[in-house]
């Protein structure tokens, strides 16, 4: 067989330089000397008979050939990492790392408990949690940067044919008010009363905001008429704003358990309106699924669904 004109170490160096933007920073990230990685790149360029970086730029900029090699080299390195993980799995969860993604609310309020339960049973498995928007996390799963993710919204349209989505539980979204608000003394509030409230809201691109607007619209409520006092990108900031009397807000029930227990906000029921969204596990079915990934998925199903549902959802996963 003809020898390959590059090594895995050379591909790792190329990837590090492209990521860090300079040979010096790449050398530091790889814990090697700058002359060593410069020599590796020179050898690689000679073996391939191409220039991989633009000369004369302060920033390490890839040439067209360099970008092409990086694209395919990244796939080669990812496949090598999958191979190593598959071999590690032969030891039946005796170690390894599970990288979990989560959207903002689930990552902040749900995942710490789930990861804690998983670590109690499998302490030898290291767990990393990445919390971002549903869109970013979905792309991380698609690209293989995350093993699986728990999200509370829909995956981006362009990824719906790429990712496998398994819905496992409902998450109710509650309308919360300051305890001092007059409506907190009422029973159910009427739909028309919503137009009299001042709202603290997530930005319009958040998945929770989209779910809320959609469900309210189905009940004949036009959320575009709401008085939005301010938009924030943090659930904690929104809760603090409500507690301070700045307005009302829709948040996940999982995010206000402590506040309800302490009685510092009021959960207002809207007459004949319940807002719920589905929580889902997403994976990339075209990538290797480690035993840790499969086991964590099964643990979630065991916690949240009935035995009959568990069998159906397990078959999907």
From Swiss-Prot:
Keywords: Chloroplast, DNA-binding, Plastid, Transcription, Transcription regulation
Protein localization: Plastid, Chloroplast
Tagged with keyword Chloroplast: yes
DNA-binding region(s) in UniProt: 23-42
PROSITE patterns: HTH_LYSR
Cellular component per GO, a single term: chloroplast
Major localization listed first in the record, in broad terms: plastid
Domain HTH lysR-type: 6-63
Sample GO molecular function, one term: transcription cis-regulatory region binding
Family under the similarity heading: Belongs to the LysR transcriptional regulatory family.
Function, as annotated: Trans-acting transcriptional regulator of RuBisCO genes (rbcL and rbcS) expression.
Protein name (Swiss-Prot/TrEMBL): Probable RuBisCO transcriptional regulator
Species classification: Eukaryota, Rhodophyta, Bangiophyceae, Bangiales, Bangiaceae
Name of the gene encoding the protein in the UniProt record: rbcR
């Amino acid at each position: 067989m003809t020898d390959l004109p590059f090594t895995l170490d050379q591909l790792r160096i190329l990837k590090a330089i492209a990521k860090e933007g300079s040979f010096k920073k790449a050398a530091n990230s790889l814990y090697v000397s700058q002359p060593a990685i410069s020599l590796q790149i020179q050898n690689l360029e000679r073996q391939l008979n191409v220039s991989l970086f633009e000369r004369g730029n302060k920033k390490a900029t890839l040439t067209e050939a360099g970008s092409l090699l990086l694209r395919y080299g990244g796939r080669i390195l990812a496949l090598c990492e999958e191979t190593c993980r598959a071999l590690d799995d032969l030891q039946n969860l005796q170690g390894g790392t599970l990288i979990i993604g989560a959207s903002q609310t689930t990552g902040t309020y749900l995942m710490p408990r789930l990861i804690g339960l998983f670590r109690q049973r499998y302490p030898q498995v290291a767990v990393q949690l990445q919390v971002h928007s549903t869109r970013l996390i979905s792309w991380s799963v698609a690209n293989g940067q995350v093993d699986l993710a728990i999200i509370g919204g829909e995956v981006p349209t362009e990824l719906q044919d790429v990712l496998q989505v398994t819905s496992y539980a409902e998450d109710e979204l509650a309308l919360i008010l300051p305890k001092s608000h007059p409506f907190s003394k009422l029973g159910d509030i009427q739909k028309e009363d919503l137009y009299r409230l001042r709202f603290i809201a997530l930005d319009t691109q958040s998945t929770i905001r989209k779910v809320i607007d959609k469900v309210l619209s189905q009940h004949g409520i036009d959320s575009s008429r709401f008085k939005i006092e301010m938009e924030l990108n943090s659930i904690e900031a929104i809760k603090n704003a409500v507690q301070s009397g700045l307005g009302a807000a829709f948040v996940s029930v999982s995010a206000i358990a402590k506040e309800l227990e302490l009685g510092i906000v009021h959960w207002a029921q809207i007459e004949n309106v319940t807002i719920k969204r589905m929580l889902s596990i997403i994976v990339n079915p075209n990538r290797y699924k480690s035993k840790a990934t499969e086991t964590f998925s099964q643990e979630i199903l065991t916690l949240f669904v009935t035995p009959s549902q568990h069998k159906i959802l397990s078959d999907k996963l």
